[in-house]
Amino acid sequence: MAGMIKYLQSFRFKGMTVILGVFLAISVVLWTERSGIQYQAEIKKKAYLDRDTVVTETQAVKNIESSCLVLMDSSQADSVEAWEQFERIFMDMKTGVDLADIRQSEIPDFSGYETIVVLMSDLNPLKDVVIKIGNWVEKGGRVLFALTLQKDIYVSIIEQKLGITDSDYGNVLVDKIYIDDDFMIGGGRSFQIPDAYDSAWEVSVGETAKVYAWTDDENKVPLIWENSYGKGKFVVDNFGLCEKATRGFFAASYSLLTDVMVYPVLNGSVFYLDDFPSPVPSGDGTYIKRDYGLSIKAFYTNIWWPDMLDLAEEHGVKYTGVIIDNYEDDVSGDVVEQEDVQRFQYFGNMLLHQGGELGYHGYNHQPLSLSNVDYANILPYKTWESYDAMKKAMTELIRFGKEMFPGTELSVYVPPSNVLSDEGREMIVKEFPEIRTIASNYFVGDMAYTQEFEVAEDGIVEQPRIISGAVIDDYMELAAVSELNMHFVNTHFMHPDDLLDEDRGARLGWEKLKKRLDEYMDWLYTSAPCLRNLTASELSGAIQRYGALVIDKDVSDQELNLKLDNFYDEAYIMIRMNEGTPGNIEGGELTHITGNLYLLRAKEKSVKIEIR
């Protein structure tokens, strides 16, 4: 080697050697970039299960034995609304339930159930059943009162058994809820309640009660607590907010009831970049000019994208970008091929090489809707002139994506503005089988295509996005912590042109917006360090596995045995050990998250965990 070095040092064309070396290095970089694209394609193929092996959640839950009795009253509006949420909560937790509407059916004997959930704020219609519930708990039963109770004669009979030492007939304001850090993932802080009202029963609890959440004020009114009674246990939810954004609070409360609670989760975090790559965003560049003195094009190339890559590197994020071909509003179906391709290839290839993924957003930004859809004054869009026009536009988008990124599998579709008509969805399924995932909205919005985390009966993976933008408002914060505890998932999207829209925070400037996004990522991965960073199709594979999974639990004093039906290759399961601590494990890996909450990665269809 020393001789070779000496030879090179004496080589009279060594300057030429340096130049050739530079060109060789550039060639290697270009080859690596291209090979990175091929590598990504292989990864995505492994993410999805084969279509003919997928068991949907609807199919999976059909044969689950009922272990929980739900009592509700169809004459109470809040009871009906609560059941709408709890029906999905129990489905996703793979808990078999029997529903007893006291207005329409007899209340069955309690002896065949492990738990009872009462979805009633007014217990008067239950009459003496309230006493029976107390007696059942004393003998070892477990009961959750999920709605804020109204003080009356029957509640007065049972309130001491709930751990209550003092109560009033009125309610108090819940504008902030503080969550104990040992109770819920992301706790150890308070969360602002949007549109707060007097939703909590004004009570005090004694030393026998264990409080997990309370109002973040001087009164510290208990909002979630448990109280042992006899051989059993009561859990009380007293915060009064029962909606999709708080499902995780109820899942966490329900998990307090039994000695060991288990339920499947997704374990995944995805960050979407909508409209990326795309033509140069149009809009008001006032604040970009104010802060950087740059054009919109130069800002995105030299400031925004390097900063986004830095955030990804710091937090381990793998972006999923969804392509938009152009921003024109032509809905005739007379498609025009995009000629300015350099920008697409530059950003798209960098995203792929970073470990990310590309998907589809739109030929333009007009949602897939026909003339039967009326946007009225809600959205500034046109409808497509015909089914054939929609099809031609999607065909051109897919052609363009394949041409720009050959060898890359693009399987994810994000509807423009999260709007997708029934006809548009049917067209995607029928005409474009390469699209296997639709990613839209978790919550109801302006004509939004609203989803659950599930596989639809036609095989499409529904992957809703929970939060958006760099300005994470109070409602989104509440939803984010809820979903960490419901599905152990984060799905977020933002647009590059957020910086051009005052409604999305443009006036704040990119430095402040970047700081807020960084703060959200810090909170997320500090709260859940074992949360997997995934691309969209990888999360879709997780949704397929999670939806199919059914867990058979057997608990003794010394061990927990889990039998997993519809197990493919791996599964993630949340375990709360209210009694004992885990020891040796067979068939999986256990990670402590917080308090008595653990994440199980099951590697086999049978898992045994020692209880100490």
Annotate each language-model stretch with its function.
Residues 242-250, 260-350, 354:
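Active-site beta->alpha N-cap acidic-glycine motif
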Residues 66-74, 138-139, 145-159, 313-423, ...:
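Metal-dependent polysaccharide deacetylase catalytic core of the NodB/CE4 family, i.e.
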Residues 64-68, 199-268:
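A glycine-centered loop/beta-turn motif at secondary-structure junctions
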Residues 124-190:
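A glycine-rich, often tryptophan-bearing local segment used as a flexible ligand/cofactor-contacting loop or short
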Residues 238-241, 261-263, 267-280, 312, ...:
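Catalytic grooves of carbohydrate-active enzymes
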Residues 124-128, 594-612:
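C-terminal beta-strand-rich structural cap/linker in extracellular carbohydrate-active enzymes
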Residues 75-151:
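Helical hinge/lid and interdomain linker segments adjacent to catalytic or ligand-binding clefts
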Residues 17-25, 386-457:
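Catalytic domains of cell-wall/extracellular-matrix polysaccharide-remodeling enzymes
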